[in-house]
Amino acid sequence: MSFIFNRETFEDNSFNEVLREKLMRALNLHDRTVGSSSGAMTTGTGAVECSGAAAAGQRPPRSKGGFSKVDILKSGIIVKKVEFPTIPKLEILDLDVSIQSKSLIKGICKVSCRDAMVQITTEIESNLLLLHVNSSPKFTTPKLISNDSFTVPITMTFDKLHLEAITNIFVKNTGVGISFNDVNLDFRLQCSIKLLQSSIEKRLKASMEEVFKDVLPSVIFNMSQRWFTHGETVVPTVDKSMVSSDTPVQPRMILDESDLSDLSPANMLRLSTLVSSRQTLCLNPTAVDTISTIPGCLERQNLHRFNLRFPSLYNYYSNKEQQGAHNNEKNRVEHLKLWGRSSSNPIPTRASFKVENTLPKEVLDSNSYDVRVITAIQTKMYERASNDVVLRRRKIKMRSRKPSKANKDAVSPAQNDSGTSSCSNVASELPHASLQANPQSDEIDPAPEGGPNAEDAYKEELEDSGLRAPQDFPALENVTPVLAQLPNQQRSRLGSPLSAGRPTPLLSPLDDSHWLLQKRDPQDLRTTLYSPIRNGRFYVMPQPQLDTKEASAFLLENGKRFGFVGLLNNHNLKWGNDPPPPYREVSITQ
Amino acid sequence: MSFDINWNKINEDSTINQRARAFLNEHLESLQLPSYVSNIKMTDFKLGTIPPRITLKQIDNPLDDFYEALRLEGASIGGRDTDVQFLMEVDYKGDMLIELSAELVLNYPSPNFMQLPVKLTISDIGIHSLCLVAYLQRQLFISFLCDVSDPALDNVESPLDSNGPAFLGSKAVERISLIRSIKIQTEIGPQDLSEGTILRSVGKLEQFLSDVFKNLLRKEAAWPSWINLDFNEDVSADVESSSSAEESLPHRDDAQDFSADARA
């Protein structure tokens, strides 16, 4: 028994009263609008049986098509009595929380409930002398006709209700799904009209399966949806489908003219390149350990490696990290020995996949770090990881009247915004860091109005152009701005006063990470997504405008459309060595 | 190790643990909880026998970011003579133990209709980070800069872990984990009743909780976020009253954070 029910609730009569009212309302609601969510009002584990039994009671007339119109029920259903003398048991047998998708909780529960009692009463039409005089010939008509309404009150008592069931419960943020397995239901029916008792009982038991398979889960789901939407009435999905089925479905054209016009020719070209790149007659296996085997395309399995190349503590301080890695390797070998394995066992180290953004201990001990560099890196990583998350900078007043309570003042949103912008300013204040991937930084911003507006506009432009990378592909977002920042003269400036005197590696996304350099990958990992121009392996298609302006300015001004322009690689067309293509503006006048 | 912490003193004094527990319990009671959580209590608290190692690495002028933040708040910045910033290496691999208990409540159809007791045991907390502590303009800023590599905390999993990293690729590298290792043990179900079973060690739930916890800390205290302790006297009574009126807000905010995290 995992859940504890409030004992008082069950000892108190008021709870039974509440249940009775809810049940009655539900039954009568159901009576009026057959087919709508039956018994949506009945709730709770306690009510499970009630609504089950009640719905079952309603079922036989409903299943006879059309019978519900001339319902034999002549009055509303009155629930006389509901009793829950014993506390139901609800026990969690297993629980599973999935982290990835929108919080989904799966549980297997055992429900058991006993000795419950429901008594309902209503009136039924039962004229045993009813004659269909209209359809019968005159000569057969008897003299005595009593075709008046003849209502008989009927009381049904379900007692010794006993339910045991194993249920699967799914909780999502949209509702609660439940399915019943292994239902064991037992009850005794006492009917005031003994004649009907066996018949009703038989029908009820026959319809139980449907109740637990269909009625109850949908009832609970609808109900939970109301909870999750905070009381907003949700239109039952059944109704929706009925409405939509009224209007004839128009056949929809796939890929009509307008759809095609949305695809930019540049995109189409890129897609076709992508497709054709996959077709190879090469007998050698495609290159390992390269970020892109296809020019300009980042493959899913290489995304991680691509991400690793962003400036971060582990590749910035890579020189020292190498030693650290060496030590780790030693440790690993010892680990392996502990596990009873020979040290030469080629188990792939995690290090090659799972890189933690840590400051190497050696760097810390040798004092060869710079706080400002670290802050810049961390700020940049923060910005890249969370675009929309507001910066948290709590202010706690220590001198307030109640010093014992830490009075947390949430920073107002406005301050938050400014805080965020301030921290992006940091990067621009540190020229050596040059982490600023935004085109906002002063040197390269051709539109002097600057500010966030310009940036937004720029982003919109990026989105307009078909070439924008998908959301989960954060790397490519930076491609164009980085390219824009690229000019060589800037690089020379990067030798900053802060790092003066010490030959620290440059902190710049443009530079190849030393970590990678030290790996000495035979395939030459430098795919230089960052620095196609510097690398000089590209032939930028000459365009008249390009000559007059700086590339960055060009991108910013009318960067409506970026196109993929072919590239020549100077590695004898061997795959695996191709740097990705430059993104460049296709000359389309606005 | 710059700070010599006489941890034995703490251990010898058994009242310290109790007092800390009492204080934390008091704080927990004052929290305004969402309606579906009740009775949150700290049932056990042990500081442990292993002290944190705190090393002072650098004393410097405060970073410009702090001044910038103050300036944006509209505070006038006075002389900078007394402003100072410490860079500290915090290394904690102790055996602190926290036991929390709470009850999840279903308030339908009647209030407090159904409860689910949950017990959490938190231990094995491992931190090795650089922490920036700046004091300027009578305000204290605390922010965790970055993690420091530590063989004891890196790659905690054994090399034989079958949950291969092959699909880790989707995740970008986190800038800081702050809490490098944490162990959360869960128990679901009432402790005292003998009937029925107690669901123990729900792995996924533990993972989920530790993620929520880590994310919360990362969001609140890791650079470029920070915690700002203001030692200034309140300027006027108005400010004070408004701040005390807002007192409940951050907690609710926290709860929303939590649920938002849970949904995310």
UniProtKB/Swiss-Prot annotation, chain A:
Residue ranges, annotated region (Disordered): 393-456
Keywords: Lipid transport, Lipid-binding, Membrane, Mitochondrion, Mitochondrion outer membrane, Transmembrane, Transmembrane beta strand, Transport
Origin: domain of life: Eukaryota
GO molecular function: lipid binding
Boundaries of every SMP-LTD domain copy: 1-225
Cellular compartments annotated: Mitochondrion outer membrane
Record text on subunit structure and interactions: Component of the ER-mitochondria encounter structure (ERMES) or MDM complex, composed of MMM1, MDM10, MDM12 and MDM34.
Role played: Component of the ERMES/MDM complex, which serves as a molecular tether to connect the endoplasmic reticulum (ER) and mitochondria. Components of this complex are involved in the control of mitochondrial shape and protein biogenesis, and function in nonvesicular lipid trafficking between the ER and mitochondria. MDM34 is required for the interaction of the ER-resident membrane protein MMM1 and the outer mitochondrial membrane-resident beta-barrel protein MDM10.
UniProt family annotation: Belongs to the MDM34 family.
Protein name: Mitochondrial distribution and morphology protein 34
Taxonomic lineage of the native organism: Eukaryota, Fungi, Dikarya, Ascomycota, Saccharomycotina
Curated annotation (Swiss-Prot), chain B:
Entry membrane topology: Peripheral membrane protein
Assigned GO CC terms: endoplasmic reticulum membrane; ERMES complex
Molecular function GO terms recorded: lipid binding; lipid transfer activity
Taxonomy, superkingdom: Eukaryota
Region listing for Disordered, in residue ranges: 240-264
Primary site of residence: mitochondrion
GO biological process terms held by the UniProt record: aminophospholipid transport; mitochondrial genome maintenance; mitochondrial outer membrane translocase complex assembly; mitochondrion inheritance; mitochondrion-endoplasmic reticulum membrane tethering; peroxisome organization; phospholipid transport; protein insertion into mitochondrial outer membrane
Cellular localization per UniProt: Mitochondrion outer membrane; Endoplasmic reticulum membrane
CDD domains in UniProt: SMP_Mdm12
Keywords of the record: Endoplasmic reticulum, Lipid transport, Lipid-binding, Membrane, Mitochondrion, Mitochondrion outer membrane, Transport
Annotated ranges, domain SMP-LTD: 1-232
Any matching Pfam family: MMM1
Residue spans crossing the bilayer: none
Biased composition (Basic and acidic residues): 248-264
InterPro entries assigned: Mdm12, MMM1_dom, SMP_LBD
UniProt-listed PANTHER family: MITOCHONDRIAL DISTRIBUTION AND MORPHOLOGY PROTEIN 12 (PTHR28204:SF1)
Family statement: Belongs to the MDM12 family.
HAMAP family reported for this sequence: Mdm12 (MF_03104)
Written domain comment of the UniProt record: The SMP-LTD domain is a barrel-like domain that can bind various types of glycerophospholipids in its interior and mediate their transfer between two adjacent bilayers.
Function summary: Component of the ERMES/MDM complex, which serves as a molecular tether to connect the endoplasmic reticulum (ER) and mitochondria. Components of this complex are involved in the control of mitochondrial shape and protein biogenesis, and function in nonvesicular lipid trafficking between the ER and mitochondria. MDM12 is required for the interaction of the ER-resident membrane protein MMM1 and the outer mitochondrial membrane-resident beta-barrel protein MDM10.
Quaternary structure and partners: Component of the ER-mitochondria encounter structure (ERMES) or MDM complex, composed of MMM1, MDM10, MDM12 and MDM34. A MMM1 homodimer associates with one molecule of MDM12 on each side in a pairwise head-to-tail manner, and the SMP-LTD domains of MMM1 and MDM12 generate a continuous hydrophobic tunnel for phospholipid trafficking.
Name assigned to this protein: Mitochondrial distribution and morphology protein 12
